[in-house]
Each structure stands twice: as structure tokens, then as C-alpha cells.
Amino acid sequence: MRRVVITGMGIYSCIGKNQDEVKDSLFQGRSGIGIDPARKEMGYFSALTGLVERPDLKKLLDRKKRHSLAEQGEYAYMATLEAFRQAQIDEEFLLDHEVGILYGNDSSAAPVIEAIDVIRAKKNTAMVGSGSIFQSMNSTITMNLSVIFHLKGINFTISGACASGSHAIGMAYLLIKSGLQDCILCGGAQEVNPYSVGSFDGLGAFSTREDEPEKASRPFDKGRDGLVPSGGGASLVLESYESAVRRGATILAEVIGYGFSSNGDHISVPNVDGPRRSLQMAINDAGIPLEEIQYINAHATSTPVGDLNEAKAIAEVFGNHRPYVTSTKSQTGHEMWMAGASEVIYSFLMMNNGFIAPNLNFEEPDEASALLNIPSRRIETEFDTFLSNSFGFGGTNSSLIIRKFKENN
């Protein structure tokens, strides 16, 4: 089995449009959450959201390519530019090699609704436009990026709810590890428009702390009252160690463990057993003692039951070993399909720069979070290995273990 390394990363989120901006936001404990006036006008119970600026692609892509990109595809494109740049992968390399793409996405709401509005108003399907179909499919990101970047390897979308981005990395890891692919672009993206979360809002799943947006997302805190939706794009370049060395690439980190499970239980209420099995599988796959995992970026979305059960699962698996545990969603909100990929990048940036961002708004633990080592202030510490959890509706669970690259690991 081959070693799987990370050679490039790109991030476009509510706390920064590139790695440098995001690293600074994490270090400062800066929130990217605010109020969306459009949601207030539409009658949403909560107008809270991660605030992500749409990129201007006019100088980067021709009109035809822009016409096929949905909002989340724009974010993914920007993240991919940064990831390929860092990996030192240019167009010539992409044309000459079979680079694959596995990307997490589980909705494309705005193009679907906009197309239906046109059909109902105009009574003419031709008025929808040629780009609509390519924007509205769940595979919109992989189909567009594969064309834009000439990707010739594996090409499909991972649709695994809020674990989509994490599973995309995990599947890329398995394919490269087994020798079926040498290099894969993977990640996740999430649209931020109001249409994408309307039904979520109707379920009462969102925090309603609109008077203090930066205090609304409060993972593990006893007073949490729901999640804050968010989005953006996160891309990573995974490749075999041999491929990276052959190219002379700088190796950033190594993926050493992937765990997954299904709860086989309630469609929206998480349990303890599924996450516990995912965690344990990742640790077994990595083949390392628990003590080597020094930090966990939890899935914790700031929901009462979800955070409670994840805390219980972590406590069961790790026992007396108490690594630092935080949820970067306290700064970003829940980036949903993107979160599993973005949180690997957030964790890497912290690991690479010797700090752990604070779990914002963690003021009082509940019965389960009291069992964990959750810092409410920034911790400046060196660590070599982290674990990232991502869970989703339908009971899909993913856990990834990443460590600093060392030649003799």
C-alpha cells in the first residue's frame, strides 16, 4: 500500500479568501457570521449565515465556462486555483497526466428554483438557458472543474450530506493508497444563497441569536440553540508519495487514517454508536496509539443532540487521553457539504503554525462536553497529528487522521 500525501490546499470561506487570510482569522478567533437581509425579507426564522463574497471570474474564465458554474462551483474554482498553485501543478502537467477529481456537493438549489421560476413565468422551457442544467445537477462542481482544468482521471461527486467533503478526501485516499490513481483533486463546496437552507430553517434547526451573530454558533456550550449555515469552497491535492517526489513537490502533510460508518438509525438525529465506530476505524487504519492524536476538530455544529452525542463518542474512544477538542464552526458556522474538507485545511493551518484556534462561545459545558478538553481561548502549542470528524443526515459518518509529513514515518 502506498503513502498518501497532501501537496496543495485552497480555501475560500467566510473567514478568508485564501490560506493566509484564513490562518489570520483562525489565530485571531475572528467570526465570519452575520445577517443576510434577504432571509429577513423572505420570512426566515433566522437570517444568520456565514458571509461569503461571490468572486468576480470575468478576468479568469470565459463567458461559456462561467455560464455553467453554479455559486458553489465559483467557490470551488477559486479554491482549486490556490491548491494547484501551491502543489505546483500547471496546465501542461494536467494535460499530460491523469489527475482525478472527487468533490463533495449535495445540493444546487438556486439554479433549480430560478429555472422553475422562469418556466412558470414565461411558459417556455427554452428561456431557461443552456447553462442551467450544468448548474443544477449535484455533480455541477466535478463536471465543470474537470472541463476547466482538463482532469482525466476519476471523476464523480460525493453526495454524503454534511460529510461529503470528508468522504471525498477519504475516497481519494483509498484510491491512491491502493494504486488505482496517482493524483486526485478533492474537496467540498457549499452554496450560501437562502434557497439552499429554506427547509432547514423551517425545521427550526438554526440559531436565532440574531442580536449577536458572532455569538450564535456555540459548539459544545450548554446554551447552544442551533447551527448557523455557511459555505464556500475547499480544495486539496492528494497524491502518492512517489508521485510527489517524482514531481519535486513540497509535501505538506500525510493522510494516515480514514474511518466511516452509518448509524442505521434516525434520519436526522445522530447517535453515539455510529460516530464511535467511525472514530475507531480511523484510528485502527492509522495504526497509531491514541496518545499521538493531539487535536480533534469536531463535527459539532452547535445543535443540542448532535454535540452531546459526539462528545460522548469522543470520550468513549479516547478515555483518559484528553486531546484538545474544538469545533472551528464556532467561527465559520456550518459549511455543510464543504465542512469536511475545509476543516482539514483549518486544522492543518493551525498545526503548521503552532496554535489551536479557540472554541468560541464555549462558556458552560454540558454533561458530555465537560468530559472533553475544550479550550475557549487560543492555545499556542506544537502538534503533529490531528483528527477531523464529519457527520451527516442519514447517519453518514467520516473521520480523517492527518499528520505532519516526515520521510521516515
Model-derived segments and spans:
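ACP-dependent fatty acid/polyketide chain-elongation machinery
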Residues: M1-K65, A87, E242-E254, I345-L360, ...
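Condensing-enzyme catalytic core mediating Claisen C-C bond formation in acyl metabolism
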Residues: R3-T7, R30-I35, D211-A286, Y295, ...
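Conserved beta-ketoacyl condensing-enzyme motif
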Residues: I6, F27-G160, A189-V197, L290-V305
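Conserved small-residue
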Residues: G8, L26, T80, I101, ...
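A glycine- and small-aliphatic-rich helix-loop capping segment at beta-alpha/alpha-beta transitions
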Residues: D20-F27, A110-A126, L175-S178, S199-E210, ...
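Active-site-proximal alpha-helical scaffold in enzymes
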Residues: A76-I89, N138-I141, S146-F149, N155-A189, ...
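Glycine-/small-residue-rich "gating" segment that lines the acyl/pantetheine channel
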Residues: K122-G129, G170, L174, E191-R246, ...
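Acyl-CoA/ACP chain-elongation machinery
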Residues: L180-D225, Y258-P270, A298-D307, H321-L372
